[in-house]
Amino acid sequence: NYAGNVSTQECADNYARAFQVLYQAVKKSDRNARVFISLDHTWTAWTGDGHPGKEYLDRFAYYMHATEPQMEWHVDYHPYSNPLYRNDFWNDWSSTSGSEYTSYISMNNLWVLTNYLKKIENRYGIKNTDKDGNPDPTGGIRVILGEQGYIAANSSQEASQAAATAYEFYIASANTKVDAIMNRAYLDDPAEGIMTLGLRYNRS
């Protein structure tokens, strides 16, 4: 999704147009398939490159509503800890707060994302109820947590990695907007240095 040195608005608009082409191709093959946009854990923080997720999401949602309001779209979120190598995400209330304007969204404050998506649904009239007007747990903008993980470079870190992994699955299962959760890696990747995110060591 690298678009060069462009504004958030221009980047999100280009992304939305590409998404619309992808959506048509996917639906032609499988009309029941869901199509997702991908966002990382940076929510309002400015890191010097890329675009803050909240601003990007706002512009994407606006463009989609203005041009193709009938197209359904969903969010693949990557709720890594901040910093990336932190396992005890539940102790981070400085960069991952409960505010809509939090700097980052990790598993510690995942509800900030899903609550904000509900606001977008209401803003643009995205259907999230059944035919009788009752809340539809499978309707509206759905979420998959498509990439996250916790480090264990040695046996002393295994317990904290296991605790973080178990807790993330508990949080995801309790959130009615989340349909799936996938960890970053099964095996450590030596090329990633200290980011030993695999559930198993790579001894090769």
Identify the function of each model-found stretch.
Residues 1, 75-77, 183:
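Non-cysteine beta-strand/loop elements that form the S-adenosyl-L-methionine
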Residues 1, 38-40, 186:
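Short loop/turn motifs enriched for small/polar and acidic residues
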Residues 3-4, 98, 154-204:
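Aromatic-rich peripheral "rim/lid" segments of glycoside hydrolase catalytic domains that contact
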Residues 9-158:
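Noncatalytic carbohydrate-binding groove/subsite architecture in carbohydrate-active enzymes
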